């Protein structure tokens, strides 16, 4: 919970962001290892990802007898791998630019959300692109880190963010990365299979009076997207907001036609603001679930539980009702249960 709240209050670290440092190191390794080869790309993805997982596992083991240190590290890693505040800020700024009719500025701003070619996009297409990115990144930048943090603690947090970053760097279908980036892209698909569907279900849960429509559109249209994961949350958002997503997109000169998701109107800037609000609600629901799930997983168990357990076993505390300690542990279990963008 501490990491989630820190991200909500302050957003990404302004300097020396660990994800940016990882990206710099990964880019240097790519320069040394690149070849138009799937095996070479798989080796590159494995080195980068297992390096991050290994660091997380080493810190998890090193702090097994130091619950407060584990608490601080888990909170810090959760903060740096989450992107909820930054995502909401970018969506809100895009909505402001589009409402003001500042289309050239909105075209430039879209690159903060996705890799789509915005050169020829009008206001309607910019709105659709931003709304789709808000939906997809609600899963990628919020739900998935929380899920992997709850399941696998620090190794899960760092490993997931490493894979997601590699996918954003090399997971393209361009001539350079079609083969070299294949392994990173497929691995990212695998680790997002469960979180994306949790994100879609939470979207329907948070859709208020359109919960049934969100669920129906998700189940009907989620598999129509070329990505096994992005379409799940995008379809749920389309149903929740009563809008239509999908269409023709351009990436680096390659044109891609995607199936329509939903059956409502074309999204407008006001719908982009609604998508941001829905994204925040989904994030809150996800952190509540992560808080409840973390104590049940060996690597995701809350360090506060360990603190409470040791305190309760001390002679000075034997007379204290242990249920208070247990309640404190449950309330704070999100500490370890918590845990921007890809080929759009």
Where are these regions (language model features)?
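Short amphipathic, positively biased membrane-proximal segments
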Residues: 1-344
